[in-house]
């Protein structure tokens, strides 16, 4: 019996020892680098504090540890997922080196500092930031950075390639940079404009004494060496929210907004003594184009009489889409662009540099923030590992009295500043209505004064003010197009354009069937590209489609040029015959005069956004009342109406009608020919793919020694500015077909388009003929394959005649370059069938 008891006891002891060993393995400290580990739990520190020991105690303690059996570590209590670990010593040292700030090390910091670090980590977590922004409003902004040059660089940097990078401070995602520029004579001239789209969150004034507060939106700017990444020239931080505040304050105080900030930052390190010149600007990309920010003074809690950076309290009101407000008349004086007063120039002092040596150690430059931010920098790795959270449902409770006042009428802006007045405070509604009536009376007076100024010719309105209003209108119209898809009535077709009245006298909205798809979500069938050209949706099958469907094919049109009379008169075929005299340089000349932007990999929305943004920036720089942005929208509307007007009648009857009345603008010459051009470029695609039924009638040699039309050209925009007139007008452009279903891959080669028009008894222009042509060579196999692939995929491809195949086999060994062309004339206000012209040999 005693033996059984002793045996069971030994087995229990062995089992207990195994359990203790297993527990120790489970709860022992992981052997992983702490700096790279992330956990999702909040570790609660132990309250026990280790006691101080003497040297004598250490010996006894060491002996006791040798005799004591190691016990398993007690398990930590955790609250998932709320955990934020304090920064490590390595990260603290990096921050000290980069920003030259004195930071305590973890072992030197007290328990209160540890709690502070823990709190910062929690508030920088994306779900928490999403909850904090529930009561805030969001502004969509476009930051424009015009990189001018890096000047006064040391002579030792000549030949070094430099670039400028701009990115959000908290993350490296979405960073943009300039093209490399080589330093020459101590200067690197970039002359490039960068764009970054972002959101700025702010809390509007609540009418209780608290002004509007913006959330910091810092951006990081720095110069870098392309061929020497280890070089550092200094980094600078600009807060976009501060720029918005300054612009709003100056607008409310002086009546003129800040259009541009000139920045000149001193460089450090190897480029000490040099400076980086930039021009910063921003555009509010909201429905109202930013007009509401500068007109609704109560929204930001500011009054026109308040000084800059001194927000006065007021009661903001929100307007419905049907309401309106008349801003106070703007001041006629406008100051020039100004620079923030402080925080820009470098304050670091570095030793001089005589020569550029990449081997010597360089000093770490400090970041020079323009505005001092209280919030810590958010780390890019945190944004990558944490998922994005958005608040999908939120609401704000309103007081019943406020709802009653809002239903009675729009609440006007009131100052909360208390003054001694003998009023009856027992009836706040009565006081509110009196204030409201006073505000409405002021608005009516301002409206009458504006109408009177317009009747007098608008002498009091300056050119810069007209630029502001046109820019706001352009942005508002463009952004409304992006959000009105559910109505399925595009704004392009709702405007009454002269061209639609001249063509068919019938609005596009009257047509019950749609034959053109949109290029993107609610942006229409025509958009302008960044280089000033156009991207046009096509429907070569003439079938009914939905606007939300993806087009099967689009054509990208370059900027138009005009052939001057010095080139001599020439018909369509004669025009291409003389062009062929350039020989092998023909394609390079065409691409230099009528270049097109590369759209591979972009979306329709991105192309449209880049086009309107480029037009707005160009209009700002030129400071013209008739801005390029306004002309962009007008030209897009014209081409959209031309592509849609009369299409249904043409499909039903098969008759190609042309504009009956003379055209008033040279821009309409190409627009009225778009539908015929759509058919002819598809025929040209078949020629490139060797899938055409009819061969060229014969081949001719290029015209040598005659005037080349490409050498006597001028851009259409300059031709209009100089108010030139020609009896016979020839407009040239290039067209590249692209497949939207293949990320806008190029289909076939580039085609040259020539539209000829004549002046009709000083009444206007009349289109007479349309011609297209392109270079076909055996070496360009990719063009032929992409053209054939699209035609076969959509059932429009078929083999050509056997004669063409035999002819091709006979000339297999020869490298031929031919210029093919198609022509179509107008007779009795109708387009005739296009015919194939003789091919022209380029050699």
UniProtKB/Swiss-Prot annotation:
Native source species: Arabidopsis thaliana (Mouse-ear cress)
Q: What job does the chain carry out?
A: Necessary for chloroplast and nuclear photorelocation movements via the regulation of chloroplast-actin (cp-actin) filaments in mesophyll cells, and together with PMIR1, in pavement cells. Required component for both the low- and high-light-dependent chloroplast movement responses via an abscisic acid (ABA) pathway. Involved in the ABA response pathway during seed germination. Modulates ABA accumulation during periods of water deficit at the seedling stage.
InterPro entries xrefs: NT-C2 (IPR019448), PMI1-like (IPR039614), PMI1_PMIR1-2_C (IPR048972)
Q: Name one Pfam family in it.
A: PMI1_PMIR1-2_C
Ranges of Basic and acidic residues compositional bias?
Answer: 365-381
Residues with the modification Phosphothreonine, per the entry, are: 404, 410
Q: Looking at the record, which segments are called Disordered?
A: 30-65, 88-116, 300-412, 450-472
Per the entry, induction is: Repressed by osmotic stress (300 mM mannitol).
List, as start-end ranges, the regions of compositional bias called Acidic residues.
Answer: 456-472
Record-annotated C2 NT-type domain positions: 131-284
| Record keyword Magnesium present | no
Query: What's the protein here called?
Result: Protein PLASTID MOVEMENT IMPAIRED 1
The UniProt entry, under PANTHER family, shows: PROTEIN PLASTID MOVEMENT IMPAIRED 1, PROTEIN PLASTID MOVEMENT IMPAIRED 1-RELATED 1
Question: What is any one of the record's Gene Ontology cellular component terms?
Answer: nucleus
Does this UniProt record's set of keywords contain Cytoplasm?
A: yes
């Amino acid at each position: 019996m005693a033996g059984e008891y002793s045996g069971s006891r030994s087995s229990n002891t062995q089992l207990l020892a195994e359990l203790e060993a297993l527990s120790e393995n489970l709860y022992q400290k992981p052997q992983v680098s702490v700096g790279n580990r992330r956990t999702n739990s909040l570790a609660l520190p132990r309250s026990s504090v280790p006691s101080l020991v003497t040297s004598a105690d250490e010996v006894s303690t060491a002996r006791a540890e040798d005799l004591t059996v190691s016990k398993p570590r007690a398990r930590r209590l955790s609250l998932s997922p709320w955990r934020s670990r304090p920064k490590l010593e390595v990260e603290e040292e990096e921050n000290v080196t980069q920003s030259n700030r004195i930071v305590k090390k973890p072992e030197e910091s007290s328990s209160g500092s540890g709690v502070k670090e823990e709190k910062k980590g929690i508030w920088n977590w994306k779900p928490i930031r999403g909850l904090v922004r529930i009561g805030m409003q969001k502004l969509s902004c476009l930051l424009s950075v015009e990189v001018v040059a890096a000047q006064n660089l040391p002579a030792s940097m000549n030949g070094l390639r430099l670039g400028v990078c701009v990115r959000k401070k908290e993350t490296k995602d979405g960073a943009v940079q300039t093209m490399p520029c080589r330093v020459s004579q101590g200067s690197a001239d970039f002359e490039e404009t960068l764009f970054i789209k972002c959101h700025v969150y702010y809390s509007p004034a609540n009418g209780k004494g608290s002004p509007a507060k913006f959330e910091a939106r810092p951006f990081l700017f720095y110069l870098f060496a392309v061929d020497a990444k280890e070089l550092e020239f200094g980094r600078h931080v600009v807060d976009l929210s501060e720029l918005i505040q300054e612009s709003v304050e100056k607008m409310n105080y002086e009546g003129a907004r800040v259009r541009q900030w000139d920045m000149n930052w001193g460089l450090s390190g190897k480029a000490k003594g040099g400076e980086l010149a930039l021009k910063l600007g921003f555009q509010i990309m909201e429905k109202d184009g930013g007009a509401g920010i500068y007109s609704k003074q109560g929204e930001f809690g500011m009054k026109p009489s308040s000084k800059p950076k001194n927000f006065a309290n007021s009661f903001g009101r929100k307007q419905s889409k049907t309401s309106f407000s008349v801003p106070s008349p703007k001041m006629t004086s406008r100051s020039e662009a100004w620079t923030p007063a402080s925080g820009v120039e470098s304050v670091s002092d570095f030793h001089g540099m005589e020569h550029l040596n990449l081997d010597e150690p360089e000093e770490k430059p400090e970041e020079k923030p323009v505005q001092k931010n209280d919030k810590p920098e958010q780390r890019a790795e945190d944004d990558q590992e944490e998922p994005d959270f958005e608040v999908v449902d939120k609401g704000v409770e309103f007081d019943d009295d406020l709802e009653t006042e809002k239903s009675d009428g729009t609440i006007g802006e009131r100052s909360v500043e208390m003054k001694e007045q003998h009023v009856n405070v027992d009836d706040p509604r009565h006081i509110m209505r009196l204030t409201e009536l006073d505000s409405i009376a002021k608005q009516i007076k301002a409206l009458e004064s504006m109408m009177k100024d317009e009747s007098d010719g608008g002498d009091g309105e300056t050119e810069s003010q007209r630029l502001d209003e046109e820019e706001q209108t352009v942005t508002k119209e463009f952004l409304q197009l992006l959000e009105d898809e559910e109505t399925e009535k595009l704004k392009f077709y709702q405007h009454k354009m002269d061209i639609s009245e001249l063509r068919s006298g019938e609005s596009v909205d009257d047509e019950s069937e749609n034959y053109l798809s949109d290029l993107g979500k609610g942006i229409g069938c025509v958009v302008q590209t960044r280089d000033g050209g156009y991207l046009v949706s096509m429907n070569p099958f003439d079938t009914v489609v939905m606007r939300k469907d993806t087009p099967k094919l689009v054509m990208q049109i370059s900027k138009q040029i005009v052939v001057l009379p010095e080139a001599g008169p020439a018909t369509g075929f004669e025009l291409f015959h003389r062009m062929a005299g350039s020989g092998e340089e023909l394609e390079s000349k065409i691409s230099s005069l009528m270049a097109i932007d590369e759209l591979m990999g972009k979306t329709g929305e991105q192309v449209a956004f880049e086009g309107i943004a480029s037009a707005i920036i160009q209009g700002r720089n030129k400071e013209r009342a008739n801005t390029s942005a306004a002309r962009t929208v007008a030209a897009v509307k014209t081409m959209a109406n031309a592509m849609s007007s009369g299409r249904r009648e043409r499909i039903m009857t098969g008759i190609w009608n042309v504009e009956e009345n003379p055209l008033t603008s040279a821009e309409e010459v190409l627009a009225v020919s778009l539908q015929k051009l759509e058919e002819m470029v598809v025929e040209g695609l078949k020629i490139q793919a060797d899938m055409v039924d009819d061969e060229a009638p014969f081949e001719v040699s290029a015209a040598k020694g005659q005037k080349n039309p490409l050498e006597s050209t001028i851009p259409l925009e300059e031709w209009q500015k100089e108010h030139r007139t020609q009896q016979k007008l020839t407009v040239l452009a290039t067209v590249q077909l692209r497949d939207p279903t293949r990320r806008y891959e190029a289909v076939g080669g580039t085609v040259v388009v020539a539209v000829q028009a004549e002046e009709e008894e000083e009444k206007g222009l009349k289109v007479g003929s349309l011609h297209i042509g392109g270079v076909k060579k055996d070496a360009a196999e990719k063009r032929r394959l992409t053209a054939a692939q699209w035609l076969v995929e959509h059932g429009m491809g078929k083999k050509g005649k056997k004669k063409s195949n035999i002819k091709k086999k006979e000339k297999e060994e020869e490298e031929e370059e031919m210029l093919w062309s198609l022509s179509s004339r107008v007779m009795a206000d109708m387009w005739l069938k296009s015919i194939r012209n003789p091919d022209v040999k380029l050699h």
